[in-house]
């Protein structure tokens, strides 16, 4: 019998035991932002290997690990599960784009050190609301030029859909916490166009 594929996991959140708020997308997203570094610091080696072992016992043979910080790469590489390791890139500020790209390149190079038939370094553009077009262009170009697998979060909620289509709604209010005059970087069509041919 073939193994299952879990194409989108976040092992960096393996330590989550009720820290994140579920239900409303924006409340959940706020709890992720507030807790992600703490959860990532708590999710190391043994805990990640335990979570992978639990997935394998349930019949999962391949995962798509979405990695913000890269700390779970070694555990994934040692676990025996086939891992497409999506190094995530994001950043809404044009002024910080070069720094975000540099940090991504460093993490991506670290993940390449584990490359094997069971560990495939890949790219993830976080989302259209959190990733400046300059960063998206960099990531999609890297994927094209190196024939890398790429992923993204897209249209995960009605809030995001309204934001991308009309530039208004609760997402605009939420994004105003980070930018006093938020405006969408993309329409749904223009975001998808970045991934053409991938």
Give the role of each language-model region:
Residues 71-75, 100-198:
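Histidine/acidic residue-rich metal-binding segments in metalloenzymes
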Residues 15-46, 84-92, 157-198:
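Active-site gating loops and adjacent loop-to-helix segments of metal-dependent hydrolytic enzymes
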Residues 17-81, 102-116:
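Alpha-helical scaffold segments that flank or form the walls of functional sites
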Residues 2, 37-38, 125:
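Proline-centered helix-kink/hinge sites
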Residues 9, 66-67, 85-89, 125-127, ...:
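A cross-domain feature marking catalytic cores of carbohydrate-active enzymes
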Residues 3-14, 149-158:
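Histidine-centered catalytic micro-motifs
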Residues 93-100:
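Short, charged, surface-exposed secondary-structure boundary motifs
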Residues 1-4, 9, 56, 61-62:
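N-terminal capping/lid subdomain adjacent to the active-site entrance of alpha/beta enzymes
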């Amino acid at each position: 019998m073939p193994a299952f594929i879990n194409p989108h996991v976040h092992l960096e959140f393996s330590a989550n035991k009720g820290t994140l708020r579920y239900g409303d997308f924006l409340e959940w997203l706020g709890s992720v932002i507030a807790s992600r570094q703490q959860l990532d610091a708590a999710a190391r080696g043994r805990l990640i290997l335990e979570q992978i072992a639990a997935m394998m016992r349930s019949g999962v043979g391949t995962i798509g690990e979405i990695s913000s910080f890269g700390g779970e790469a070694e555990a994934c590489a040692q676990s025996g599960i086939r891992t497409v390791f999506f190094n995530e890139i994001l950043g809404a500020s044009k002024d910080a784009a070069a720094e975000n790209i540099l940090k991504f390149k460093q993490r991506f190079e670290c993940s390449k050190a584990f490359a094997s038939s069971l560990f495939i370094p890949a790219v993830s553009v976080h989302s259209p609301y959190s990733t400046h077009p300059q960063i998206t262009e960099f990531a999609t170009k890297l994927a094209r030029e190196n024939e890398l697998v790429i992923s993204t979060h897209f249209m995960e909620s009605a809030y995001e859909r309204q934001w991308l289509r009309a530039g208004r709604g609760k997402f605009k209010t939420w994004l105003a916490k980070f930018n006093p005059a938020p405006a969408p970087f993309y329409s749904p069509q223009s975001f998808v166009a970045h991934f053409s041919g991938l």
